[in-house]
């Protein structure tokens, strides 16, 4: 028990977290050097391609020091803001964390966010300065930054290079010396926290747990508190990225996989507590927050017959990613689909990509929206995620929208660009701090709606990619918001409705109809494209009809004959216009996302 160390690695994207994990694994000899691949911990293809960690992974390592064998459980965490939920989950099951900072880049916005999660969990934090082999490395400057921003003492910070392997041995020994062993339970009944669960085609739903009290053996009957169900333990394993290692017992402080042979991962949902059926723990393990979706979008199969396939795919994906929520919805324009809730934009992209890749679906995603709180004139307040659910204008007292607290770290030369960008996004500055003479930390309150579309891309281009950005939800505030509807040939297209601030409605509406005019195919009759708020049309464009020469057959002859044919054509067009349907191409729905 005293020889167990549970720790995770905190870092901003690209600061070398997965490489450092690989280095520690190979130093401990857990994975054969022939099998060792770059980024052993990142098992998904998307993770390797994008160079990001999405799912938290774990590995059990052994290390010999001064004649004693130590067990190190390394719990990998994602660095990206959308997956901070995975981070808080991983950190809840550790006693310590390595704070990895790139020696040339310095502290970034997401590093700060994750450190605060670690400090809230009272973890022992070891600062690690990585990439000291780079010519641009300035370890001393980075140590000063950590002390200035986070307030951690860096006198004993460890300098390593995960690429060349310098300092890795010293790092492992520091982990053993500094990170405390798990606290022993006072002979309490078995109690463990599920901090990850996923689906295996052979074994069913697997629960990755951290044991807090007692022990569990193969064949024991266990009780899952959240679902109020009993199951028999079929197998126990220690996690390893290549293949799990079987064991007969999991004891206090250990991290392991429990196999219960379940068909459904919702039976072992993340954050739940597993205890023994006979000798139950009295209360569940607390301090665990469920993920709350922030961004909602409609996902529709391009082939409408594939609706059930999409449902199956989402069910299976939820097994691995407990943070998505979804419910069926229908759209007059797109047919049947789902309203899916995501943690953020990167999460939305990754989920859509995984659905298309792993399940072979072709999907249309509508414009992402956030949850609004609408207080009606009768005093009733409702939450809406879809603009088409908004009550009629005369029934709305006011609308509240979610705000986020954003932290941005940027080189000072781009400060002007960033302030301009944020002012255009209705942001309010709350703090500005010069970390060094060349780097600035900014804090802003921004409406969530302003960052869900393309804020991250715009920020990167305003700062040539040097700024880092992180956000956390803060509160709901009353906003001056209206619903902008788009009508094509007199019919409102529900999938194109968006909620916008009133002062931006005119310009958005104009841009909208202009873009749509280019995309709607020409018909045999005129098509009006209108942007409206309630019944008031604020912008309009017309797609001209295709000409058809009805008088071509008349050679010479009387003018009245031609006039008669032209009149007849005019009548026909009028009738067509009244009943004509216009089909919108896929690009029309995506164009919404591109309008600034």
Curated annotation (Swiss-Prot):
Domain tr-type G, chain residue ranges per copy? 2-183
Q: Which Pfam families match?
A: EFG_C, GTP_EFTU, GTP_EFTU_D2, LepA_C
Family annotation (SUPFAM superfamilies): EF-G C-terminal domain-like, P-loop containing nucleoside triphosphate hydrolases
Binding-site positions, GTP? 14-19, 130-133
Instruction: Look up and give the membrane topology term.
Output: Peripheral membrane protein
GO BP, sorted A to Z: positive regulation of translation
User: What keyword terms does UniProt attach to this protein?
Assistant: Cell inner membrane, Cell membrane, GTP-binding, Hydrolase, Membrane, Nucleotide-binding, Protein biosynthesis
Any one GO CC term of this protein is: plasma membrane
Subcellular localization, per the record?
A: Cell inner membrane
Major place of residence: membrane
For this UniProt entry, the molecular function terms from Gene Ontology, in alphabetical order, are: GTP binding; GTPase activity; ribosome binding; translation elongation factor activity
Enzyme Commission numbers on file:
3.6.5.n1
**Class of enzymatic activity (EC top level):** hydrolase
| Domain of life of the organism encoding this protein | Bacteria
Catalyzed reactions: GTP + H2O = GDP + phosphate + H(+)
Q: Note the InterPro entries from the entry.
A: EF-4, EFG_III/V, EFG_V-like, EFTu-like_2, G_TR_CS, LepA_C_sf, LepA_CTD, LepA_IV
Instruction: Fetch the NCBIfam families from UniProt.
Output: lepA (TIGR01393), small_GTP (TIGR00231)
Give the similarity note: Belongs to the TRAFAC class translation factor GTPase superfamily. Classic translation factor GTPase family. LepA subfamily.
Biological role: Required for accurate and efficient protein synthesis under certain stress conditions. May act as a fidelity factor of the translation reaction, by catalyzing a one-codon backward translocation of tRNAs on improperly translocated ribosomes. Back-translocation proceeds from a post-translocation (POST) complex to a pre-translocation (PRE) complex, thus giving elongation factor G a second chance to translocate the tRNAs correctly. Binds to ribosomes in a GTP-dependent manner.
* Name used for this protein in its record: Elongation factor 4
Whichever gene encodes this chain, its name is lepA
